[in-house]
């Protein structure tokens, strides 16, 4: 999601909560699709030497490993961001008081 999309979504405070939820869900779907596209491109470049009629065992193992490492790394980053976010004081709450 780019900054214009996030600023548009942030300005939806007066919009119907169902619409806001729908937009959030669609944004999450878009992020997931972008992630899958990035993973596919990365693993394809890394694992496919010469496309052929069949996937050889080396390429198959490479794809499996690539996807697993990508998922592990993504999960690690998400967990780290979550920990960082929990440890920082929430400025928006303190500003509204």
Swiss-Prot record:
Positions of short motif Twin CX3C motif: 43-66
Q: Does the keyword Chaperone apply?
A: yes
Reading the lineage from the top rank, the first entry is Eukaryota
Positions of disulphide bridges = 43-66, 47-62
Membrane topology classification = Peripheral membrane protein
Arranged from A to Z, the UniProt key words for this protein are: Chaperone, Disulfide bond, Membrane, Metal-binding, Mitochondrion, Mitochondrion inner membrane, Phosphoprotein, Protein transport, Translocation, Transport, Zinc
* Cell compartments where the protein resides: Mitochondrion inner membrane
Keyword presence, Cell division: no
What is a single cellular component term in the Gene Ontology annotation? mitochondrial inner membrane
Residues annotated as carrying Phosphoserine in the record are 57, 87, 94, 96
Where is the signal peptide, in residue numbers? none
Instruction: Kindly list the GO molecular function terms attached to this UniProt entry.
Output: identical protein binding; metal ion binding
Pfam families, from UniProt?
zf-Tim10_DDP
GO terms of biological process kind? protein insertion into mitochondrial inner membrane
Instruction: Give the domain section of the comments.
Output: The twin CX3C motif contains 4 conserved Cys residues that form 2 disulfide bonds in the mitochondrial intermembrane space. However, during the transit of TIMM8A from cytoplasm into mitochondrion, the Cys residues probably coordinate zinc, thereby preventing folding and allowing its transfer across mitochondrial outer membrane.
Family the UniProt entry places it in: Belongs to the small Tim family.
State whether it acts alone or in a complex, and with which partners, per the record.
Heterohexamer; composed of 3 copies of TIMM8A and 3 copies of TIMM13, named soluble 70 kDa complex. Associates with the TIM22 complex, whose core is composed of TIMM22.
Q: What does this protein do?
A: Mitochondrial intermembrane chaperone that participates in the import and insertion of some multi-pass transmembrane proteins into the mitochondrial inner membrane. Also required for the transfer of beta-barrel precursors from the TOM complex to the sorting and assembly machinery (SAM complex) of the outer membrane. Acts as a chaperone-like protein that protects the hydrophobic precursors from aggregation and guide them through the mitochondrial intermembrane space.
Query: What is the recorded name of this protein?
Result: Mitochondrial import inner membrane translocase subunit Tim8 A
**Source organism per UniProt:** Bos taurus (Bovine)
Taxonomy of origin reads: Eukaryota, Metazoa, Chordata, Craniata, Vertebrata
Q: Gene name on record?
A: TIMM8A
């Amino acid at each position: 999601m780019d900054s214009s999309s996030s600023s548009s979504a942030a300005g939806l405070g007066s919009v119907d909560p169902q619409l806001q939820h729908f937009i959030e869900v669609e944004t999450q779907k878009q992020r997931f699709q972008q992630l899958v596209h990035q993973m596919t491109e990365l693993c394809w470049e890394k694992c496919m030497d010469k496309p052929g009629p069949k996937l050889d065992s080396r390429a198959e193992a490479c794809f499996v490993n690539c996807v697993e490492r990508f998922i592990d790394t993504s999960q690690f980053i998400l967990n780290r961001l979550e920990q960082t976010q929990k440890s920082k004081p929430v400025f928006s709450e303190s500003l509204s008081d």
